[in-house]
Amino acid sequence: MSTEEVPVLIVGGGLTGLSAALFLSQHGVSCRLVEKHRGTTVLTRASGISSRTMELLRGVGLERTVIERGPKLVEGARWRELGQPADQIPWVVIRANGLHDLENAVTVEEPSLDVGHLSPTRPYWCGQDRLEPILRDEAVRRGARIDFNTRMEAFTADESGVTATIVDQATGEQSTVRARYLIAADGVRSPVRETLGITRTGHGTIGNAMSVLFKADLRDTVKGRRFVICYLPNPDEPGVLQLPEVPAVLQLFDEDRWIFGFFFDPRETSPEQFTDERCAQIIRTATGLPGLPVEVQMARPWEMSHNSARSYRSGRVFLAGDAAHVHPPAGAFGANGGIQDAHNLAWKLAAVLKGTAGDALLDTYEQERLPIGAAVADQAWIRHTWRLNDSEELRRALRESTLVATGYRYTSDAVLGAAYPEPIPAAHDLTGRPGYRVPHVWLGRGGERVSTVDLGGDAFVVLAGPDGGEWQAAADKVAQDLGVPVHCHPVGGDGQLTDPDGAFLGTTGLTRNGALLIRPDGFVAWRAEYLPEDAAGELRSALERILARTSGTPGGTALEG
């Protein structure tokens, strides 16, 4: 049996795995993905795409494609102000006694989606069944090999790589793949995680649920009271748990398709007992619309849980997405977190594989993403509990949605001059501090608008003030000496980037000759308040530390808090 060699093997072809293949390909890294299912999902989950995830998709040229596949998410008040446009969805969560009584519905959550000052893009609504093919096609176009109906039967890992047994499920043929690294994006139950013996912490299983995708014309019923989620009383049906604190949930999927969810006790009722007709009747009862024509398109059982892996790395193997963290769907954080895991890991693997970074850079994947994954899981748990049982204690623990999605921060060896007590701050602080994503400022280039967020992608970026032209020579020298792509962009002055609104220095807090060092994933790695005497030496020292090449000590300003 021949052995195929590949730099990175990805197990799991959901949103996280496909994103990993795409982002690795963006950085020029060959990879192979194997997925046991026959194709991308037909299940309708993970519809809400955060502005941060949209930024990542924008970075690989997919923003317009996603926008064309789904409606824009807007604030409820804004939607009403605009006359309730059909091509927009208000992000509103309500609780009602039935769809026949929406005029008395109570608004549970109506978060602000005003991210124009934070991001060059915004949240959109695009279900997993539509997003996965988009990611797959772009990853393949960029050179990734993606094999569905193919599973990893077993693997062994050693100090130099991973050896995996791969099975083509259509033919039964076995083959061997030798990879430098393995990304386990193989879901909640993650055989890879279990094989490695990585344990998890959290609340564990919350309950067994049934999700029913159905088609029904509810346009007139919900007219003027549109929502993304509506909590309804559980119908008095055999097998449906009658717990007042756990209601049924109705969620919009698209114009005339909806997802209805309820909990059941598997000790008393098996999933097979929920036939299409029975599910349709449960939906009619819960909505209070006994004559509603319902076409059940799919019903699937699933387990709601709250768990975070205690480690994201074991030698040459990395956990990502649901394999690393899983939580209730409240907040729409799950898929976004998995895509962001993949984005964080991809540039680091690329740097190590290309020989421009030391292996210790890969340790920063866990240093950065594990605290975020655990904190986001906790925020989803808090939201889930708060929506069902409001309390002042839960309100105090709750973080605003855009803060969880965009405002988080990293503390790691790849962030210099800053350390933070927790990954999600109490308020937005996108001001150019190390560990945060670069603040969004609209700049001008060649007569067009470009965001500071758009300037990275496949290289480090030095973003300097208008009198920081000398950073260009420093960046060029360091790039040549280290063999690392470093682009320099003085903003204003004689540079190609203009600051038409005069917002750059005020937003970043830089002096006119200071600079930010931005990582390929868009996060600030280091900042210099002023141009140092030896700009090239300071920049080189910073990059060597970030890339785990030496223990040099760069200048810059230390930040805490």
Curated annotation (Swiss-Prot):
Positions annotated as active site in the UniProt record: 231
Biophysicochemical property: pH dependence: Optimum pH is 9.0-9.5.
Keyword Oxidoreductase tagged: yes
Molecular function GO terms recorded: dioxygenase activity; FAD binding; oxidoreductase activity, acting on paired donors, with incorporation or reduction of molecular oxygen, NAD(P)H as one donor, and incorporation of one atom of oxygen
UniProt cross-references to Gene3D superfamilies, sorted A to Z: 3.40.30.120, D-Amino Acid Oxidase, subunit A, domain 2, FAD/NAD(P)-binding domain
GO terms classed as biological process: antibiotic biosynthetic process
Pathway: Antibiotic biosynthesis; tetracenomycin C biosynthesis
Swiss-Prot/TrEMBL cofactor(s): FAD
Bilayer-spanning residue ranges: none
Keyword set includes Oxidoreductase: yes
InterPro entries reported for this sequence: FAD-bd, FAD/NAD-bd_sf, RIFMO-like
Intrachain disulfide bonds: none
SUPFAM superfamilies for this protein: FAD/NAD(P)-binding domain
Residues binding FAD: 15, 35, 128, 152, 322
Pfam families for the chain: FAD_binding_3, Rng_hyd_C
Reaction catalysed by this enzyme: tetracenomycin A2 + 2 NADPH + 2 O2 + 2 H(+) = tetracenomycin C + 2 NADP(+) + H2O
EC number: 1.14.13.200
Keywords for the protein's UniProt record, in alphabetical order: Antibiotic biosynthesis, Dioxygenase, FAD, Flavoprotein, Monooxygenase, Oxidoreductase
Described purpose of this protein according to its UniProt entry: Involved in the biosynthesis of tetracenomycin C (TCM C). Can use either NADH or NADPH as electron donors, but prefers NADPH under physiological conditions.
Subunit annotation: Monomer. May form oligomers up to homohexamers.
Protein family (similarity comment): Belongs to the PheA/TfdB FAD monooxygenase family.
Protein name: Tetracenomycin A2 monooxygenase-dioxygenase
The organism of origin for this protein: Streptomyces glaucescens
Species classification: Bacteria, Bacillati, Actinomycetota, Actinomycetes, Kitasatosporales
Encoding gene (name): tcmG
